[in-house]
Amino acid sequence: MHAVLITLLVIVSIALIIVVLLQSSKSAGLSGAISGGAEQLFGKQKARGLDLILHRITVVLAVLFFVLTIALAYIL
């Protein structure tokens, strides 16, 4: 059981890293916030299309990551 949970945790971790890297950036970064791009940084921007799907997958994988981590902590 322990080996299965560790294997699942590694798979979820790698998938989470890949999905986060595939997401597009939402702002110009820190330089945009300092030089007057704050309206874009704090404005409401809804994800559409592929960004929405990647966002939802990220949330699901993050929840799985925490559940698996807590499960492994209690098994040890």
Swiss-Prot record:
GO terms for biological process: intracellular protein transmembrane transport; protein secretion; protein transport by the Sec complex. Its main location: membrane. The keyword Transmembrane helix applies. It is found in: Cell membrane. Induction: Constitutively expressed, part of a 5 gene operon with multiple promoters. Not ethanol-stress induced. GO terms for molecular function: protein-transporting ATPase activity. The keyword Flavoprotein does not apply. It holds the Pfam family SecG. Keywords: Cell membrane, Membrane, Protein transport, Translocation, Transmembrane, Transmembrane helix, Transport. GO terms for cellular component: plasma membrane. The chain crosses the membrane at residues 2-22, 56-76. It is a multi-pass membrane protein. Belongs to the SecG family. Involved in protein export. Participates in an early event of protein translocation. This is Probable protein-export membrane protein SecG. It comes from Bacillus subtilis (strain 168). The gene is secG.
